[in-house]
């Protein structure tokens, strides 16, 4: 049965990538259908009950700057907020929030259920309608065909999903959900490179069986920060509660090493490679055998939940072994496991087969986002869903495209890494992956991206007004401070000198004075003659960072200008690299396989040398491809 409701975009999957994808295309104005196997699990946190962290928090802020829902949802559902690296520079500071699972899912649903242009339908997708190498729709398990101009696949770990607890394995997309085996088989029949990855989750523990008195208490920050640039004064956080910290010990490690042969990972049952930066407890004990203990964060699953998430104890060991090693840990001596931990392996598709828009190179109008591309994490998934669906929506009746770059966002770093380097293990974002960290800060994500969001129609009128007002306030106040001079013999100078290490000897602007480490905006405000009455903390923060890091920021902007030349030089999709004399067979093979869209993208493919880029540039100039 064919249902042609005139959909522009179909999004398959209601996880974190799917939610951002469906919301983005609908906000732009595309008639959007979200297909999910279960409406009740839309926005569900399948693994850890938290949003953000190092690198990940930056992604959430960028999603928010583009009008996404993740930051607002966690502001509505967060039960503990912390700024990580708060004593370090602004480039590496990151927000992290503990979530109430129930409240988070409720928040997500409240945001998308009120979204215009968005329909939601419950059914699994088993097949795609593909005509002349172009996707035209999706076919559900019950035989319904929905036609659309674009399809975005955000299917998480459901493609060929297999759950492992010890040597017991069963098919599943996650605990309690069936996998998408028919869709996995269909995708394998298409000309994509496919492989397997693995991830895992720890056992859940009944909080009533835990002794918190012997654990370290971890409180959130006060005042409580907000994730969204648009939440303050509009959204009230739920009640805030602490997390706890405990540690494994030698007994824990002995129990695990004595039973490694029973682990699905170590017995050879699992083919897929697991996440390097979120390893199972078995991996940690083996890889870091010299460590006497490993830190475990004991995280509540919600204000009204009795379940605890022991972050750091992901496992594929048998249930009996899980019980034994859990009870060897301080505070868990009488722990009752409510849900066993498990590992899950699933299909992913080589992201080098994608364009920077996340459209596939082999099937037109088909986009991949999230774990299907080899990433791990809610934040990485949401970022990809956003970009994929933006491009699906804006290219419906034109050849328009937009994608972030390494110079303007961590989302750009994420996508560029995936499409140029691919991945052999679940990819996680870190600040260390970015070249321009001082420019790509959490605090200025809106200043970097919200202008584009306004242009694309992604922000509500209210959020647009908030952003424009903030941006104008920053510009106006910085200009004023750069044009306000203080002479060394004035009363203002004498008032200032109580904050300075030495007397003023020359005339300085307020902006230059703010560059000094001993001066901040609040001290300048104490000088009544200056009439500095600004009260907006977010605006003040941008003024201070602009002053104190001005030299470094200028240097990074110059570096960006140098690399921008290559990024602007497009390579035609049908370019014949064999005509370029001097390219090695390895370089020729890689360029032909990956079909980079720009010289900049080509330069970042592993194995592509600067000499090869020079040869390519010279040839393209000679033949008129670039000027």
From Swiss-Prot:
Top-rank lineage group of the source organism: Bacteria
Entry keyword annotation includes tRNA processing: yes
Cofactor(s) listed: FAD
Any one of the GO BP annotations: tRNA wobble uridine modification
Subcellular location: Cytoplasm
Binding-site residues, FAD: 13-18, 125, 180, 371
Annotated InterPro entries: FAD/NAD-bd_sf, GIDA_C_N, MnmG, MnmG-rel, MnmG-rel_CS, MnmG_C, MnmG_C_subdom, MnmG_C_subdom_sf
Keyword Flavoprotein attributed: yes
Known partners and oligomeric status: Homodimer. Heterotetramer of two MnmE and two MnmG subunits.
Chain's role: NAD-binding protein involved in the addition of a carboxymethylaminomethyl (cmnm) group at the wobble position (U34) of certain tRNAs, forming tRNA-cmnm(5)s(2)U34.
Membership in a protein family: Belongs to the MnmG family.
Record NCBIfam families: mnmG_gidA
Protein name: tRNA uridine 5-carboxymethylaminomethyl modification enzyme MnmG
């Amino acid at each position: 049965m064919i249902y042609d409701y005139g959909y522009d975009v179909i999004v398959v999957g209601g996880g974190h990538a799917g939610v951002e994808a469906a919301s983005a295309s609908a906000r732009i104005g595309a008639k959007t259908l979200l297909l999910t196997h279960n409406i009740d699990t839309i926005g569900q946190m399948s693994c850890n009950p938290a949003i953000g962290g190092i690198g990940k928090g930056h992604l959430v802020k960028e999603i928010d700057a583009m009008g996404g829902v993740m930051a607002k949802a966690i502001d509505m559902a967060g039960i503990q907020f912390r700024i990580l690296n708060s004593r370090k520079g602004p480039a590496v500071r990151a927000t992290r929030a503990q979530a109430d699972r129930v409240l988070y899912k409720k928040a997500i649903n409240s945001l998308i259920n009120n979204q215009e242009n968005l329909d939601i339908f419950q059914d699994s997708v088993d097949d795609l309608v593909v005509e002349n190498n172009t996707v035209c729709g999706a076919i559900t398990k019950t035989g319904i065909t929905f036609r659309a101009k674009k399809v975005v696949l955000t299917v998480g770990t459901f493609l060929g999903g297999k759950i492992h607890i010890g040597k017991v394995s069963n098919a599943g997309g996650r605990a309690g959900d069936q996998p998408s085996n028919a869709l996995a088989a269909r995708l394998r029949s298409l000309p994509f490179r496919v492989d397997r990855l693995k991830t895992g989750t720890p056992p859940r523990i009944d909080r009533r069986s835990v002794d918190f008195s012997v654990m370290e208490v971890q409180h959130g920050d006060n005042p409580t920060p907000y994730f969204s640039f648009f939440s303050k004064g509009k959204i009230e956080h739920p009640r805030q509660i602490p997390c706890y910290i405990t540690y494994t010990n030698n007994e824990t490690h002995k129990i695990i090493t004595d039973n490694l042969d029973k682990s699905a990972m170590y017995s050879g049952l699992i083919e897929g490679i697991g996440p390097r930066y979120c390893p199972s407890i078995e991996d940690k004990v083996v890889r870091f055998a010299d460590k006497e203990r490993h830190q475990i964060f004991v995280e509540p699953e919600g204000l009204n939940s009795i379940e605890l998430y022991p972050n750091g104890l992901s496992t594929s060991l048998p249930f009996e072994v899980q019980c034994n090693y859990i009870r060897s840990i301080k505070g868990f001596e009488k722990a009752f496991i409510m849900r066993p931990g498990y590992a899950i392996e699933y299909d992913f598709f080589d992201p080098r087969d994608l364009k920077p828009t996340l459209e596939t190179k082999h099937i037109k109008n088909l986009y991949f986002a999230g774990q299907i591309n080899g990433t791990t994490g809610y934040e990485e998934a949401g970022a990809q869903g956003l970009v994929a669906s933006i491009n699906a929506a804006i290219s419906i009746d034109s050849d328009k495209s937009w994608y972030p770059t390494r110079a303007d966002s961590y989302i750009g770093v994420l996508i560029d890494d995936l499409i140029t380097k691919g991945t052999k293990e679940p990819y996680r974002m870190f600040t260390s992956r970015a070249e321009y960290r001082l420019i790509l800060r959490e605090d200025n994500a809106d200043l970097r991206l919200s202008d584009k969001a306004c242009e694309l129609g992604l922000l509500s009128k209210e959020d647009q007004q908030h952003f424009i007002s903030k941006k104008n306030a920053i510009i106006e106040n910085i200009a004023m401070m750069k044009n306000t001079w203080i002479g060394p013999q004035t009363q203002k100078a004498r008032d200032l000198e109580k904050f300075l290490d030495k007397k003023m000897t020359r005339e300085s602007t307020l902006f230059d004075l703010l560059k000094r480490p001993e001066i901040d905006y609040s001290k300048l405000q104490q000088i009544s003659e200056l009439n500095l009455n600004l009260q907006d903390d977010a605006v003040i923060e941008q003024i201070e960072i602009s002053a104190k890091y001005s030299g470094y920021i200028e240097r990074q902007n110059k570096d960006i200008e140098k690399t921008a030349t290559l990024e602007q030089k497009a390579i035609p999709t049908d370019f014949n690299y064999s005509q370029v004399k001097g390219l090695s067979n390895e370089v020729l093979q890689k360029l032909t396989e990956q079909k980079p869209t720009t010289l900049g993208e080509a330069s970042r493919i592993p194995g592509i040398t600067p000499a090869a880029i020079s040869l390519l540039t010279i040839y393209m100039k000679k033949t008129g491809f670039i000027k």
